[in-house]
Structures are given as C-alpha cells and as structure tokens.
C-alpha cells in the first residue's frame, strides 16, 4: 500500500513540474498572448531558449559604412580628420572655454557608435563634394565663433555708479590725436617678413589687405598676401598666395571680392575671394606684361568697364581690363620722347588726379616727378612734353598721394588738386597739380618752347629716409608719414607746418607703408618686421 502511494505522489510531482515549466516558457514567448498555453516540445523549447540567450540583432545598424569599400571609409575618415585638424588649428575654442576639447577623434567616435546599445543613423560624409562642403562650413563657422569670442565691448561691464576718469589721465599721444589700438601679427605666417603694401577695402571698412616679402632669404619666395579683419584680431580672415613675391596688393573699389596685385617678376595677379587663395587670372610676358617688378597699382573708372593701372621699373604703365588679361588695353611709355633711344623712366609710384582719369603723376628712382596723360588709342605715347619738369627731390621717390582740397589754407587752395611725395632725401614735398603762373620758373632753352620748371609749395623735413606718405581722408589738412627710424608722424597744416603735431614709434623698427581707412579715422602702418599697427586718429574737436 505504501509503495502505491509513493508512486502516485512521484507521478503527480512530475506532472506539476512539467506544467510549471510549460507556463514559464509561454510567459517568456509573449506576455500579451490571450490564448492558453500550448504544448511545446523539448526541441522547440531548446531552440527558443537559444534564440533568447544568443541574440543576433544586438549590434546597431552601422553596417552602411562597413558594407562600402574599406578604402573609401578610411579615406573619408582621414579627410574628415584633416578638416577637424585644420579647424582646430585656426580656431581653438578651448583657448576661450577650457571645458571644450580642442580636437575630435573620428575613429574613437565610430568605435563608440559600433558598441552602443542604440542604433543611431550615421551621417559622416563619404563623397569629396560633401567633404568640401563640410570643410567650408567649419572654416566659416570658426570665423563667426571667433569674432563673437573676440568682440571686446567696452560697454559690457560699464559701471555707471563710478565717476568717470579725468581727462588728465590721458596719455600725451592721445591728447595730440593718436591712439594705438592693436597690432596684427602671426608668428607662423609673417615671421621675419617685410610689409610691402597696405590697403583698406572700400566695401568692408574692417578689412585690411597687406602683402609680405622675406628679403633675408637668398631666393625670392612665393607671394603672400593676408586679409586682416579689425573685428577679428586672432588670425587672418583670408590668405592669398601667388607664384612670385607680391610687391603691391590693393582691393578693387568697384567690386567687393576682387583684389589685384603686382609681383616681383612683373606679373599682375587677380584674386577672387569667392574662388579660394590662388589667383583666378594673371598676366605673362607673352601677353605684353611687365618685364621688371611691379611697383604700384591703382584703379580708374573707365566706362563701360573699370580698369586696373600698373606701373613698373621697366618704364611702362599698363592699363588692364579685369576680364581680359591676355594683353593690356593701353600702354604708356614713361619717357620724354617715344621715338628716342633714351632710357625709360623707372617708375616707383603712381597716383591719378581725382575726378580725372586722363592725368596722373608718377615718381621715379632718380627723384623726378612726371606728369602723365592717357592716350585715347592703344598706341604707346610719351608721358609728358619735354619742356615741363617738376624740380624738388633728387633721389628715390618712395610714395605719392593726390587729393582735392576742400578747405582754404596758407598752402592749400579750395577745390584745387594737391600732391604729397616722400623721398629717400629725408623730405616730404607738397605740390599743386595745376600750378598757377607764379609757381612756374622759365628757363632759356635751345628749343622753340621755353623750359617750364614747377617748384614744390612746401618741404617737410624729417630725421631719416621717408618711405611713405598719405593724406588723411577725414581731415583735409592732415597727413601721415613713416620713416626709417620707425616714426609715425602726424602733420596738421592748420597747427604747425614745421614739425609734426605728434609722433609715435610702435616697436622701434622702421616703418615703410601706411594707409588711412576710408571715411574713418583709423590709420594702419606696417614695418620691416611684419607687424601691422592700427591707430585711431582723434581730431582736435574729439581730443578736446
């Protein structure tokens, strides 16, 4: 009897265990199944448990990258990483916000995505076009971020409860009309370089274009020009390059994106800021370009097109159309007689008469100041009659600037054109472009016409060689000059005609180029060490 009872108990226990296992399996298959538990065989149960214990869909859907060729993915990662490296080299957010990392590792990011529990969509660019778009986006975004971080607003932390500082605390330099703002320099790009030219943009008042050279090297280096932004002082806005050293570079006053430059080998380059850092057009010797270094560039409005005018030490002035650099539209020979065998005049600087596209003044290496007239035809023409000469300088003329006076002064006459010339003879001279009869000196000559000598109105003596001079745009009686001692001199003809009203030596190095900001009071000067200094000119009314 006892044996039968034990046997029945074991049978019931086995049935209960089997029912319990079946209920657990059905709950694992689907908790939302409304039908009752079904009979599952041991093979089906084992297969089901294997599917649960060894899932095949745990890795995220990142096979789109692996399904492509491995070479394309590796190239893509390398290109993207190079873009991030160039981005981090030009703009390091961690310099301003330390909590942000400087670099981004693409490979570490991809590993993290592959081992994550979720499956995010991968949007890494795989084509060259997408990588170029990403590169342009990063560079443009970096500039915008850096401009915002570098914006130094004096009104941001103004405390209106504190008494304003007294004017007595101002430096003597500020009281006399100059205030040093900041300095443009880049040790990686402009180290051991010399500033060849400085020019402001006529469309964007904050943009400044400078060209550089490295005279210490035995061979002439490739050309370098930098577009600086006065609102973004940490790094250049754009870097322009050329095959030869850029001797002069000026932006177009008629197009906001075009910049023309002259080179040491005689070529003329034209850059478009929308097309990258290399020229979109350039001249050659075969096309009738210059044979010697280009010394100056200017623009004239000659409807229906706007022309680029270049002069060189080869004694020629070329007039170019921006859309056709195959040959100059006009050539002017800087000599007294076209058909004579005399040597051409080596031009060093050039400036057109305001509101007159037919007349210009050009300085030469021998100190002569010549008056030129454009021809209505494409043939070579003499620069001026042989019986007219400007007497004053006797050595190299380094700079020239012409303006129309809108004020009356002892030396300036209203609505008349006046020119300033700087020279290596330690002087700056003032000339009237259309002098009156009493400024002429008649000298007997064997020719039928009398020799006419035009003398300068005033001579401003300096303490060293003068490298450049420019009229002030906002103050008609003021001009600035720079010399070999590193002096930035500010002259005011209404205050003193014998000495500058103020002077400053930015860093003790010689200064050789200067430029005024259009319709503003900012002044830029560059030196032989590659630094560009920005000053603010305070008029007497503002200074007082």
Curated annotation (Swiss-Prot):
The keyword rRNA-binding does not apply. GO terms for cellular component: cortical microtubule cytoskeleton; cytoplasmic dynein complex; cytosol; meiotic spindle pole body. InterPro entries: Dynein_IC (IPR050687), WD40/YVTN_repeat-like_dom_sf (IPR015943), WD40_repeat_dom_sf (IPR036322), WD40_rpt (IPR001680). WD repeats lie at residues 241-281, 289-330, 342-387, 402-441, 461-501, 506-544. The keyword Transferase does not apply. It is found in: Cytoplasm. Has a role in meiotic nuclear divsion where it promotes the movement of 'horsetails'. This is Dynein intermediate chain 1. It comes from Schizosaccharomyces pombe (strain 972 / ATCC 24843) (Fission yeast).
């Amino acid at each position: 009897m006892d044996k039968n009872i034990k046997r029945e108990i074991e049978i019931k226990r086995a049935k209960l265990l089997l029912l319990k296992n079946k209920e657990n399996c059905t709950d694992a298959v689907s908790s939302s199944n409304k039908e009752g538990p079904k009979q599952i065989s041991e093979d089906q149960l084992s297969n089901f448990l294997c599917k649960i214990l060894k899932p095949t869909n745990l890795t995220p859907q990142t096979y789109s990258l692996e399904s492509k060729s491995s070479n394309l993915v590796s190239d893509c990662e390398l290109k993207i990483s190079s873009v991030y490296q160039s981005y981090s080299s030009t703009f390091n957010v961690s310099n301003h916000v330390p909590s942000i990392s400087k670099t981004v590792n693409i490979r570490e990011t991809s590993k993290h995505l592959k081992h994550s529990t979720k499956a995010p969509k991968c949007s890494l660019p795989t084509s060259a076009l997408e990588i170029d778009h990403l590169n342009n986006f990063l560079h443009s975004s970096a500039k915008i971020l850096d401009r915002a971080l570098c914006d130094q607003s004096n009104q941001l932390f103004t405390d209106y409860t504190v008494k304003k500082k007294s004017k007595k605390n101002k430096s003597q330099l500020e009281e006399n009309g100059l205030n040093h703002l900041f300095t443009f320099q880049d040790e990686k790009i402009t180290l051991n370089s010399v500033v060849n030219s400085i020019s402001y943009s006529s469309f964007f008042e904050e943009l400044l274009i400078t060209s550089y050279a490295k005279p210490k090297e035995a061979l002439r280096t490739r050309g370098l020009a930098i577009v600086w932004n006065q609102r973004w002082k940490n790094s250049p806005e754009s870097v322009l390059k050329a095959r030869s050293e850029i001797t002069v570079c000026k932006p177009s006053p008629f197009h906001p994106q075009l910049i023309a430059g002259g080179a040491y080998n005689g070529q003329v380059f034209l850059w478009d800021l929308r097309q990258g850092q290399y020229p979109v057009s350039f001249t050659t010797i075969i096309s009738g370009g210059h044979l010697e270094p280009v010394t100056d560039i200017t623009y004239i409005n000659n409807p229906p097109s706007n022309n680029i005018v270049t002069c060189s030490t080869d004694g020629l002035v070329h007039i170019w159309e921006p859309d056709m650099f195959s040959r100059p539209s006009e050539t002017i020979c800087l000599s007294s007689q076209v058909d004579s065998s005399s040597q051409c005049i080596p031009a060093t600087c050039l400036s057109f008469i305001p509101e007159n596209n037919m007349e210009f003044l050009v300085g030469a290496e021998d100190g002569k100041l010549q008056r030129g007239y454009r021809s209505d035809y494409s043939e070579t023409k003499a620069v001026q009659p042989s019986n007219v000469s400007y007497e004053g300088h006797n050595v190299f003329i380094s700079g020239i600037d012409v303006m129309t006076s809108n004020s009356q002064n002892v030396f300036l006459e209203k609505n008349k054109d006046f020119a300033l010339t700087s020279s290596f003879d330690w002087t700056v001279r003032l000339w009237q472009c259309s002098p009156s009869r009493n400024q002429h000196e008649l000298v007997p000559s064997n020719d039928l016409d009398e020799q006419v000598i035009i003398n300068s109105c005033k001579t401003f003596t300096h303490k060293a060689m003068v490298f450049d001079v420019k009229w002030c745009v906002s103050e008609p009686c003021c001009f600035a000059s720079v010399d070999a001692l590193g002096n930035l001199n500010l002259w005011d003809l209404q205050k003193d005609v014998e000495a500058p009203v103020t002077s400053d030596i930015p860093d003790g190095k010689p200064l050789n180029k200067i430029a005024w900001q259009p319709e503003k009071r900012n002044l830029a000067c560059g030196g032989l060490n590659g630094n560009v200094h920005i000053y603010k000119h305070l008029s007497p009314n503002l200074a007082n």
